[in-house]
Curated annotation (Swiss-Prot):
PANTHER family cross-referenced by the UniProt entry: HEMOGLOBIN FAMILY MEMBER, HEMOGLOBIN SUBUNIT ALPHA
One Gene Ontology cellular component: blood microparticle
Modified residues (Phosphoserine): 3, 35, 49, 102, 124, 131, 138
Keyword Signal in annotation: no
Residue intervals passing through the bilayer: none
InterPro entries, per database record: Globin, Globin-like_sf, Globin/Proto, Hemoglobin_a-typ, Hemoglobin_oxygen_transport, Hemoglobin_pi
Keywords of this entry: Acetylation, Heme, Iron, Metal-binding, Oxygen transport, Phosphoprotein, Transport
Modified residues (N6-succinyllysine): 7, 11, 16, 40
General function of this protein: Involved in oxygen transport from the lung to the various peripheral tissues.
One Gene Ontology biological process: hydrogen peroxide catabolic process
Entry comment describing in which tissues the protein is expressed: Red blood cells.
Protein encoded by which gene: HBA
Name of the molecule in the record: Hemoglobin subunit alpha
SUPFAM superfamilies: Globin-like
Length: 141
């Protein structure tokens, strides 16, 4: 459960991400594909090379979903319901992949905003991404 301080930290961190969200989403996906090659199996139709338009487009989708989650941090289950259905019933993504992408997002954010990535912000973002992952996997059951 996100505390009021966590919510404040997440909103402040995401505000700093701003217009770079799509780029950071794509970078996190690239990082995930390189670090955890098994995740590529969900994207057999993608050009997974560095700078790929398909990876950039999907990175923007990831970033847009996270922006939506930040905007609706008090009601993420409703805000992410359609996305949860998509990943659980149509795409059938292994839930562990959300944790892997979350880790890669944290690394990406830390690389781009080292001064802002304090232990408290890191912990808040980690809790937030874990909450998003929980919501996205809630319909697997």
């Amino acid at each position: 459960v996100l505390s009021p301080a966590d919510k404040t930290n997440v909103k402040a961190a995401w505000e700093k991400v701003g217009s770079h969200a799509g780029d950071y989403g794509a970078e996190a996906l690239e990082r995930m594909f390189l670090s955890f090659p098994t995740t590529k199996t969900y994207f057999p139709h993608f050009d997974l090379s560095h700078g790929s338009a398909q990876v950039k487009a999907h990175g923007k989708k990831v970033a847009d979903a996270l922006t939506n989650a930040v905007s609706h941090v008090d009601d993420m289950p409703s805000a992410l319901s359609a996305l949860s259905d998509l990943h659980a019933h149509k795409l059938r993504v292994d839930p562990v992949n959300f944790k892997l992408l979350s880790h890669c997002l944290l690394v990406t954010l830390a690389c781009h905003h080292p001064a802002d990535f304090t232990p408290a912000v890191h912990a808040s973002l980690d809790k937030f991404l874990a909450s998003v992952s929980t919501v996205l996997t809630s319909k697997y059951r």
